[in-house]
Every structure is written in structure tokens, then in C-alpha cells.
Amino acid sequence: CIVETVTPELGVEYAKNLGISTLTSTDLNPATALGGITDGVSNLELTSAFAAIANGGVYTEPIFFTQILDHDGKVLLDNQPETHRALKDSTAFLLTDAMAESVQTVSSFARPGATINSTSTRARLSNMSVAGKSGTTTSNNDIWFVGFTPYYTAGIWGGCDNNQSLSSNGGTSFHKDIWRKIMERVHEGLSDPGFAVPDSIETAQICRKSGKLAVEGVCDHDPRGNAVYTEYFAKGTVPTEVCDKHVVVTVCAASGMKPTEYCPEKRSKVCMSIPQDAEGSTDDSAFGIPGYCNIHTDLSTIFTQ
């Protein structure tokens, strides 16, 4: 569990720095990483925490008015919110990029032609970049969606006063529909600038099978298609190792298997490196290094083709 590496103490410190005020000493445990906190969290504080991510890591105290004027226009109260940096701008952007995927439909690399709906596609806006995260409590007693665009952040909570479980038959998705319909109205007439990439971020070409630097001409020739994608990194954290999952082997041009001494023509083929002691199978298993050619097994097979 990553929270054990980070430590619950540091995780709680970050949450408090993002404006979560309900945390107690009993929340210094790994369950807090999943939202299992003793006194829960208000929609206002959770939405404000997400707004800090949307704001490049700068937290702004939520306020409900900026000024109160008298009948002559004199300022009686000037309400300026407290702000402070809660996250590095690179961290905020990487979180934004990750949460943007939760509202997208993505192609399945393992099964070409198939698509995968992420958890919050119902919150996707027609002409605006969106990032966000949905969540539920035990037995669907509470449902959440908090998301943001380059302009605004909004949070929707759904539940019952008596804490009863919501129906799984559509009862756990309506909050995303509410969020989408409100935000569609709010963003009418606004152009989509996308999420700004800070100078503290750099990109690299990564192999999706190894998570390491892609090898040109190899990782992009995976039997299932191009396994290379562009990933964002905080500067100085780009991987230095290159992919070790894709290998180029010489095979018989006819059988596609490792050549024997009798194979008349050979070609190169990209395969997956499967550990010799691997048990079971994965999506990569069908694309491992093949056995020896079963067509050209002796000298006579050369002259019968």
C-alpha cells in the first residue's frame, strides 16, 4: 500500500494542507487513503481540495462573498480568501492528467478494436476538458463526483438522510448526470483552452508494456499495434532504463517460428519476453518467443516447397 510508504502521518498532513479539517488522530491509518476517515468530509471541503489541484496546487479558502458595501458604495467588509501552496504544480498537473482519463473512453491495447469506458464517462462535457473522480462509500450509502475544467470546479454528493443504501439500478450514476448538466450550462459560450502544462513537466515516449523508455522500431511494432505513448513526468523523474519486455528475434519467414538450419528465408519479428519460470498466462503469453520451425525440419523440406 503506497500510503504505508508515504506514511499515514504525511498523507494526513497533505489532506489538512488541502483544507480537510475533520481529520483526527484516529485517522492515522492506511484506510484514510481510501477516504475511510472517522468523521467524514463535507462537500465544500472536498470540492475546495480538488480546486487546489485545478489551480496548479494553490489552495484557496472557500468564501461566499468578497465585499459588503453600504448604500454609498463604501466597503464595510472586504473578504479576501487565504491562499497557500499545497502541492507542487507538477504534482497538481500529473493528478489532473490522471483524473482526465477517468472521463474518457479509451482503446484497449490488449484487445485491439475494443474500447473501455472509464468510471466517469457520464460526466464528460461535449466541448470542454474535464478531470475528476467518482467515489462511493460502503453499500453505496454515499456517492460522489468532484471534477473540474480549466474554468470551474464542482462537487456533487448523493445520499439519503437516513443513510440507506442507494439503488444500484441507476441510483449510483445520477450524480454524474447532475454534474454534467450543470457544468454544460455554466460553460456555454466558453472555449476550451485545455489544461495548461507547467514548465516543471516534461514528456517522454514510454512503452506501455514495460513502463520504461520505448525502443524505436521495436515497441512500436508490438504484434497488437503501437505500444508507445507519450507520458508526462515531473522534470528529473523520466525513466532512464529502456524497455526489456519487447525483443527482436529472427524467425522463419514461412512459419514465424525460430528458424532451423533448413529454413530458406528469415525475417525479424517483435516478440514479448516471458520469464522462463512464469506460471499461468497473461495477454502477453500468446506473443512470446516461439519454438523452432515445424515446417523446415530437414533438408528435404527445402526442395518440396
Which residues does each predicted region cover?
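Active-site-adjacent helix/loop patches that line small-molecule binding or acyl-intermediate pockets
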Residues: 1-20, 27-55, 98-101
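A short, terminal or domain-edge coil/loop segment
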Residues: 18, 78-85, 173, 177, ...
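A penicillin-recognizing enzyme superfamily signal
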Residues: 40-245
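Active-site-adjacent bridging/hinge elements
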Residues: 12-26, 124-125, 153-159
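Poly-acidic low-complexity segments
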Residues: 5-7, 88, 252
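Short flexible/disordered coil segments
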Residues: 17, 25-28, 91-96, 137-138, ...
